[in-house]
């Protein structure tokens, strides 16, 4: 079976990289990003041109790949023995490839103290696998509660009624639907579920500290998940909440079907472009939190692959990409945040006008240094399998009427088999 999988990966690699992944020499640094083209083409072309001007013997080959294809394509390139030198990975992808020993340990090239002086501690922590730094932090984001002022006012609420905690949010969802007959929020609970993030913010762990045992069938976890499943079953959440993916979270808001969306402020631009009428009534509030007050950190990183033929130059380019000025320039193109301490102190993140974009930027910059990884299990190399098992258990509760405790017990049992096989 393993041989068949390897053959399929090799075939995939030939198909995926034919014509664009020619053998590299030591003077070519191949750099992959995740779904940043064509929107940011000008930025990357300019950045690469500047780097090559200062390093005339080096050529940067930039390849942008779809986010959903990232794991498959990187696995294929590794199987073919021709991976990129520098690769953009989300924090949860790091564990998978670090566990395969595919990523360079960066502290063998640059002192850990130097990295700690440059980057935010929470961002650097997101780039750590089994106590080893396997990537450099790049751009960051966190969550915000985006809401439609017009719909909120029409329902008889004021800005002071906007929920700030998950317990307030559940009450608000009920009251809004009772008053208007419409949904207040679309939030994924059954596919790309946000429930683990909610549990983490409420101080309820999904796994133990060394990620060897699942814990989300505790009485506290069962009670909280049951409260959200009651919201779904009683009609206070749209049916799509159980079956649609995270990619669909913005559409119900920008179409005016719901009054709120809990997501990254980076999506404000999409709302502005796709639904200017909705955007004109949009405001933003801090992320909803649980009893811990903690909120989620979303981190992008850049890693070096072990098979890079020029690790020194690859690291130099990765440091250039993530330096203060280049991160600041990138952040000015979207509502994202830098991972370097110095860039975060720039006036761009501390002052500005009264526009919504500025409000989101200043709020995010103020809150982001305290953001953390609430979904600790994402550090497991089989995070995607674990995620799917949990999602399926929630779907079985909503669609199959399986009791919450039974569904979570079954999911915990499956998780423990995987977590124990390390």
Predicted regions and their residues:
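Short, well-ordered beta-strand elements
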Residues: 25-38, 58-63, 85-86, 134
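Periplasmic solute-binding protein
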Residues: 94-102, 122-161, 188-210, 296-305, ...
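Short, polar/charged alpha-helical segment
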Residues: 37-59, 390, 408
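Hinge/lid segment of periplasmic solute-binding proteins
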Residues: 91-144, 170-173, 178, 197-202, ...
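Long, aromatic- and glycine/proline-rich binding clefts that accommodate carbohydrate-like moieties
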Residues: 333-391, 396, 421
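Glycine-centered hinge/linker elements that transmit conformational signals in sensory
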Residues: 170-175, 211-242, 287
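Short, solvent-exposed loop/beta-turn-alpha elements that line the ligand-binding surface or hinge
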Residues: 107-119, 162, 204-225, 273-277, ...
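Extracytoplasmic "Venus flytrap"/periplasmic binding protein-like
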Residues: 50-119, 126-128, 154-156, 252, ...
């Amino acid at each position: 079976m393993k041989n068949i999988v390897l053959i399929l990966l090799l075939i995939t690699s030939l198909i995926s990289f034919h014509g664009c992944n020619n053998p590299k020499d030591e003077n070519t640094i191949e750099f992959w990003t995740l779904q940043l083209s064509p929107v940011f083409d000008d930025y990357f072309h300019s950045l690469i041109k500047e780097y090559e001007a200062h390093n005339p013997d080096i050529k940067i080959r930039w390849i942008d790949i779809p986010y959903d294809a990232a794991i498959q394509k990187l696995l294929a390139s590794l199987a073919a023995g021709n991976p990129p030198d520098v690769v953009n990975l989300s924090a949860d992808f790091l564990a998978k490839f670090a566990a395969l020993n595919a990523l360079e340990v960066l502290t063998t090239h640059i002192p850990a103290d130097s990295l700690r002086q440059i980057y935010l501690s929470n961002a650097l922590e997101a780039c750590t696998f089994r106590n080893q730094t396997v990537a450099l932090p790049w751009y960051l984001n966190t969550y915000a509660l985006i809401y439609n002022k017009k719909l909120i006012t029409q329902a008889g609420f004021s800005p002071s009624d906007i929920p700030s905690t998950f317990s307030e949010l559940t009450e608000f969802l009920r009251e809004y639907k009772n008053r208007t007959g419409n949904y207040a929020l679309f939030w994924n609970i059954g596919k790309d579920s946000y429930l683990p993030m909610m549990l983490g913010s409420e101080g309820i762990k999904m796994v133990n500290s060394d990620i060897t045992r699942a814990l989300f069938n505790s009485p506290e976890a069962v009670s909280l998940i049951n409260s959200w499943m009651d919201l779904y079953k009683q009609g206070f959440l749209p049916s799509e909440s159980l079956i649609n993916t995270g990619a669909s979270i913005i559409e119900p808001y920008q179409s005016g079907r719901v009054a709120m969306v809990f997501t990254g402020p980076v999506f404000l631009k999409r709302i502005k472009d796709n639904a200017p009428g909705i955007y004109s009534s949009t405001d933003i509030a801090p992320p909803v939190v649980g009893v811990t007050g903690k909120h989620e950190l979303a981190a992008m990183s850049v890693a070096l692959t072990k098979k890079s033929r020029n690790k020194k130059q690859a690291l130099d380019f990765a440091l250039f990409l993530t330096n203060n000025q280049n991160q600041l320039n990138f952040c000015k193109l979207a509502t994202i945040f830098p991972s370097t301490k110095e860039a975060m102190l720039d006036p761009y993140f501390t002052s500005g006008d009264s526009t919504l974009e500025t409000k989101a930027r200043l709020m995010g910059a103020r809150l982001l240094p305290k953001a953390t990884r609430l979904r600790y299990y994402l550090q497991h190399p089989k995070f995607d399998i674990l995620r799917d098992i949990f999602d399926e258990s929630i779907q079985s509760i909503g669609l199959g009427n399986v009791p919450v405790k039974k569904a979570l017990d079954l999911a915990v049992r499956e998780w423990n088999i995987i977590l124990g096989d390390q």
